[in-house]
Amino acid sequence: MGRPLPEKGLRLFCLPPAGSGAGIFYPLMELECPELSICPLSLPGREGRAHEKIPHSIPELAELLARDLLPHIRPPYAILGYSMGSLLGYEMIHRWLEWGLAPPELFITLAARPPHRSFGERLSDLDQQAFRQALSQLGGLPKEILADEETMSLFEPLLRQDFQNCENYRVQNLKALPNPISAIVSDEDSLLEIKDVTAWKDCTSGSFQLTTLRGEPHILPPKILKDVIQFQIENTRA
């Protein structure tokens, strides 16, 4: 996180999607929620943790992150998982519960399949041309970056490893979380179907809410991300 955490207010710990890092959540710093602290998390292999080896499974990465955050997990807090980040969040919350910590007030899953549903097409196995075409459809990456061979030679291995971790992850014995879950998905998401996202309701013994966005890609534009998360937080704290 790179900075001291505030003592009061709701902490929203933000877990990024495949290939991304804490920076994708920086637009949330502009949210007009005075009692909310945005806590973007950086993962191994990127940003300030670029020197760290990327774990080769979702559970292994979740274990590492859960232990990193252990000193900071106390009420009130919430988790925002963006795509891959939602799988990490599910695993991390279970670990904190096993270690005797309180659950979050809310678990927000954004553009994410639930842990007991298969990933679908294996993007990590695609050849270079097909893989980059798939990335273009997901949104979030400018065409200039996709066409820059030097940049992609560094970025593509990270993305493929993240996708492979997601593709290989599937929970067989689903354990419901006690906290509410709010799932957000776009009807134009190239990776997901709404019926799959609805299955997040199986992951909680608490309340479940589904929000469907219209016409947005898998990686949301910053303004849409800000608006949808502000709405979720205001609903939770009302």
Predicted regions: what is each one?
Residues 1-238:
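Non-catalytic, mobile gating and regulatory segments of ester bond hydrolases
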